[in-house]
Curated annotation (Swiss-Prot):
<feature type="binding site">
    <location>
        <position position="377"/>
    </location>
    <ligand>
        <name>UDP-alpha-D-glucose</name>
    </ligand>
</feature>
<feature type="binding site">
    <location>
        <position position="362"/>
    </location>
    <ligand>
        <name>UDP-alpha-D-glucose</name>
    </ligand>
</feature>
<feature type="binding site">
    <location>
        <position position="385"/>
    </location>
    <ligand>
        <name>UDP-alpha-D-glucose</name>
    </ligand>
</feature>
<dbReference type="Pfam" id="PF00201">
    <property type="entry name" value="UDPGT"/>
</dbReference>
<comment type="similarity">
    <text>Belongs to the UDP-glycosyltransferase family.</text>
</comment>
<dbReference type="InterPro" id="IPR002213">
    <property type="entry name" value="UDP_glucos_trans"/>
</dbReference>
<keyword id="KW-0328">Glycosyltransferase</keyword>
<feature type="binding site">
    <location>
        <position position="380"/>
    </location>
    <ligand>
        <name>UDP-alpha-D-glucose</name>
    </ligand>
</feature>
<feature type="binding site">
    <location>
        <position position="402"/>
    </location>
    <ligand>
        <name>UDP-alpha-D-glucose</name>
    </ligand>
</feature>
<keyword id="KW-0808">Transferase</keyword>
<dbReference type="InterPro" id="IPR035595">
    <property type="entry name" value="UDP_glycos_trans_CS"/>
</dbReference>
<feature type="binding site">
    <location>
        <position position="400"/>
    </location>
    <ligand>
        <name>an anthocyanidin</name>
    </ligand>
</feature>
<dbReference type="GO" id="GO:0035251">
    <property type="term" value="F:UDP-glucosyltransferase activity"/>
</dbReference>
<feature type="binding site">
    <location>
        <position position="15"/>
    </location>
    <ligand>
        <name>an anthocyanidin</name>
    </ligand>
</feature>
<feature type="binding site">
    <location>
        <position position="381"/>
    </location>
    <ligand>
        <name>UDP-alpha-D-glucose</name>
    </ligand>
</feature>
<dbReference type="InterPro" id="IPR050481">
    <property type="entry name" value="UDP-glycosyltransf_plant"/>
</dbReference>
<feature type="binding site">
    <location>
        <position position="140"/>
    </location>
    <ligand>
        <name>UDP-alpha-D-glucose</name>
    </ligand>
</feature>
Length: 483
């Protein structure tokens, strides 16, 4: 079987896709004669979806050099009043024996050159060491978030109080290399509540990043603030010990698959042909990720702001969440679009706007000549897709580490305009604020400057993956460390 690189994905489609993209990049550079890729993944998580096996079959068929090994089903230890992340982290730990047996079995017929794990799979780090396999982390975030996560154990050490970050409304924290401080309430969602077991899990994960052989990051050097890269390289983020090598190998983005011929395929094709008829850089695209969702009251404010702005738009609307305070929905359940939007909105904006339900082919949309701006939840994959397409953003974070991303996009990278959210109202944004930010991006001189900057970054993104690009060079350095 020769040399193999083993990747271990956290539960959930997004994590598996990211590992696949990394595997593809390695093999496309070196060829399957140099390395094969084996991806380990779990079975039975509460975040599993029916789309995962479909995706894996497709990748196995189109990329035979990538093999998948699914672990036996493990039952979630669901306890009342425990958060979904805490349940998931416990579930991952229960899979440790399967990690050990998989590495043992693979090692019988191949040389495992590297074991690359997701941050949430940190309990597998000592297992890799047990087999004397160089073990690396793969971070699907920017360098600024990596800097923050490396430094988080230090902040935990300095703030040994009984208060949670979510309650420290007047407190801000500084991270090495960041231009501006971060509100305590805007910390990564996993650490907001000190009483949630996910808090101590996250501190444990972050404290183990420096104990790996290195960290591979889905970003590219030219995108990142030099002060952040210097802070990481100079050891400022891990003041009490050495920082491992960091390899920036992005932007790694999933290739847009063909539009599925489902019941909604015609609508998706309609939105692409509609975009083709619009003037250059005139359309604002609004999409909040695969799970981002708003209650009906917020949807109405967005609609009012879009209508008042007078701008062209393509807006992906998801079904409002069942729980009013939630900002996530799973799946693409059908719903009555007219019922969640202001009466007559669709008719009044029909000449300059289009609303689609649940999903649009985002990578394809962002690359359309007519798209001139992107309202995003600041998920890192979406950010990279916009950067590659050269499209400036309006940053509207919802959950996870998205508030941290917003800070960096607006202040450090200067590629986005931030919306003003009412933290005391769950991040609510008024229709007037929507109109103001839309006009700022699409009409103002500041928006034009942002657009020019993003266009140049798009060219740099392409160059980074080229033969002499920074990300290719960093991949070569990573491979040199394992061969």
């Amino acid at each position: 079987m020769g040399d193999v690189i083993v990747l271990y994905a956290s539960p959930g489609m997004g994590h598996i896709v990211s590992m696949v993209e990394l595997g593809k990049f390695i093999v496309h550079r070196y060829g399957p004669h140099k390395f094969s890729i084996t991806i380990l993944y779990t079975c039975g998580s509460i975040v599993d979806t029916a789309s995962i096996p479909v995706y894996i079959r497709r990748i196995s068929h189109s990329h035979p050099f990538i093999s998948f090994r699914q672990f036996p089903r493990v039952t979630n230890n669901i306890t009342r009043n425990i958060s979904v992340p805490a349940i998931t982290f416990d579930f991952i730990r229960q899979n440790d024996p399967h990690v050990r047996s998989a590495l043992q079995e693979i090692s019988k017929s191949a040389t495992v050159r590297a074991f690359i794990i997701d941050l949430f799979c940190t309990s597998a780090l000592p297992i890799g060491k047990e087999f004397n396999i160089p073990t690396y982390y793969f971070r699907t975030s920017g360098a600024a978030i990596l800097a923050a996560f490396l430094y988080l154990p230090k902040i935990d050490e300095q703030t040994k109080t009984t208060e949670s970050f979510k309650d420290l409304r007047d407190t801000v924290f500084e991270f090495p290399g960041w231009k501006s401080p971060l509100k305590a309430t805007h910390m990564v969602q996993l650490v907001l509540d000190r009483n949630d077991p996910a808090y101590s899990d996250m501190i444990y994960f972050c404290s183990h990043l420096p104990k790996s052989n290195g960290i591979i990051v889905n970003t590219f050097e030219e995108l990142e603030p030099p002060s952040v890269l210097q802070a990481i390289a100079g050891g400022l983020c891990v003041p009490d010990g050495p920082t491992p090598p960091v390899y920036y190998v992005g932007p790694l983005i999933e290739e847009e698959k063909e539009l599925s011929k489902d019941a909604d395929a015609a609508e998706k094709e309609d939105c692409l042909s509609w975009l083709d008829k619009q003037p250059s850089r005139s359309v604002l695209f609004l999409c909040f990720g695969s799970m981002g969702s708003f209650p009906a009251a917020q949807l109405k404010e967005i609609a009012n702001g879009l209508e008042a702005s007078g701008q062209r738009f393509l807006w992906v609307v998801k079904k409002p969440p069942v729980e009013e305070k939630s900002k996530q929905v799973h799946g693409v359940d059908d719903f009555d679009l007219k019922g969640v939007l202001p009466e007559g909105f669709l008719e009044r904006t029909a000449d300059r706007g289009m609303v689609v339900k649940s999903w649009a082919p985002q990578v394809v949309v962002l690359k359309k000549e007519s798209v001139g701006g992107f309202v995003t939840h600041c998920g890192w994959n979406s950010v990279l897709e916009a950067v590659v397409a050269g499209v400036p953003m309006i940053a509207w974070p919802l959950y996870a580490e998205q508030h941290m991303n917003r800070n960096v996009l607006v202040t450090d990278m200067e590629i986005a305009i931030g919306v003003e959210q009412r933290d005391e109202e769950g991040g609510f944004v008024s229709g007037e604020e929507v109109e103001r930010r839309v006009r700022e991006l699409m009409e103002s001189e500041g928006g034009r400057v942002l657009r020019e900057r993003c266009k140049k970054l798009g060219e740099m993104a392409s160059a980074a993956l080229g033969e002499t690009g920074s990300s290719t060079r960093n991949l070569v350095n990573f491979v040199s460390s394992i061969t």
